[in-house]
From Swiss-Prot:
Keywords: Cell membrane, Decarboxylase, Lipid biosynthesis, Lipid metabolism, Lyase, Membrane, Phospholipid biosynthesis, Phospholipid metabolism, Pyruvate, Zymogen. The active site is at D90, H147, S252. It holds the Pfam family PS_Dcarbxylase. The modification Pyruvic acid (Ser) is found at S252. HAMAP family: PS_decarb_PSD_B_type1 (MF_00662). It is a peripheral membrane protein. The gene is psd. Binds 1 pyruvoyl group covalently per subunit. This is Phosphatidylserine decarboxylase proenzyme. Catalyzes the formation of phosphatidylethanolamine (PtdEtn) from phosphatidylserine (PtdSer). It is found in: Cell membrane. Belongs to the phosphatidylserine decarboxylase family. PSD-B subfamily. Prokaryotic type I sub-subfamily. Is synthesized initially as an inactive proenzyme. Formation of the active enzyme involves a self-maturation process in which the active site pyruvoyl group is generated from an internal serine residue via an autocatalytic post-translational modification. Two non-identical subunits are generated from the proenzyme in this reaction, and the pyruvate is formed at the N-terminus of the alpha chain, which is derived from the carboxyl end of the proenzyme. Its EC number is 4.1.1.65.
Length: 287
């Protein structure tokens, strides 16, 4: 009954208004408030501050600075397996596996369109048909920066407007097309394993998504917008494997897509597996 009421509330709540209000709270610089709120959050979610570059909670200028905190050098060593594809973020594997008939598995019989996830462009989605996906959920306690699974050159970024349903097991099992309905930022790279998409999916109270090359991407005007980076007039944007790609200010999910016959997921990983940025996510399929 509680789950049913929760799902009903997800459809009724003003997602964007609540998220913008949360963003204002998270940027509050009043010392008494930000210190108390940050301390409560760190205790409530058992955040490991010993690995943070700045361990003193009161040193952060606002909650968002704490939430997107940097880690100490070496806190996330990169897997050195030859050709390794790295996990892009801390969190848990929600699902991973093949993209079948253009669909990505969500939970308990629910799936969503890879084309819709990427913004609806058939040409962008085509290289990933028959390929592989991995969905990583970042919990409140996790490190909330997203890094490159492979070295790549940015070709395109797409802001896709949408709802901001909460992202958790309950919504994954009960909200159809969840990740293809929520607001998201699609980043398309050219890599040694062919095209790679990294999709940063928003959720309720996710106030914004940033990338290292564009800064704040959401919230702009809520309309689909494509940014091309492969034009001759632009200097190429190349990011090395393990380099920071972007970050969430309050939460959510990263989805990685590869084309067919390019990667093989690590045998130790499955739905529910805890992961850390930099660990082995997949190995290359040898030609």
């Amino acid at each position: 009954m509680k789950s049913r009421l929760f799902i009903i509330s997800q459809y009724l709540l003003p997602h964007h208004l609540l998220s913008r209000l949360a963003g204002c709270v998270a940027e509050c610089r009043a010392r008494w408030f930000k210190n108390a709120f940050t301390a409560w959050f760190a205790k409530r979610y058992q955040v490991n501050m010993s690995e943070a570059l700045v361990e003193d909670l009161s040193a952060y200028e606002h909650f968002n600075a704490f939430f997107t905190r940097a880690l100490k050098p070496g806190a996330r060593p990169l897997d050195e397996t030859p050709g390794a594809i790295l996990c892009p973020a801390d969190g848990a594997v929600s699902q991973l596996g093949p993209i079948e008939h253009g669909r990505i598995f969500q939970a308990k019989g629910h799936g969503f369109s890879a084309q819709e996830l990427l913004g609806g462009d058939p040409a962008m989605a085509a290289p990933f048909m028959g390929g592989e996906f991995a969905t990583i959920y970042l919990s409140p306690k996790d490190y909330h920066r997203v890094h490159m699974p492979l070295a790549g050159t940015l070709r395109e970024m797409v802001y896709v407007p949408g709802r901001l349903f909460s992202v958790n097991q309950t919504t994954a099992e009960n909200v159809p097309e969840l990740f293809a309905r929520n607001e998201r930022v699609v980043c398309l790279f050219d890599t040694e394993r062919g095209p790679m998409a990294v999709v940063l999916v928003g959720a309720m109270i996710v106030a914004s998504i940033e990338t290292v090359w564009a800064g704040l991407v959401t919230p702009p005007k809520r309309e689909l917008k494509t940014f091309r980076y492969d034009e001759a007039s632009r200097a190429p944007i190349h990011l090395e494997k393990g380099a920071e790609l972007g970050r969430f200010k309050l939460g959510s999910t990263a989805i990685v897509l590869f084309g067919p016959e390019q990667v093989r997921w690590a045998e130790s990983l499955g739905a529910g597996s805890a992961v850390r940025m930099g660990q082995l996510l997949a190995e290359p399929v040898q030609a």
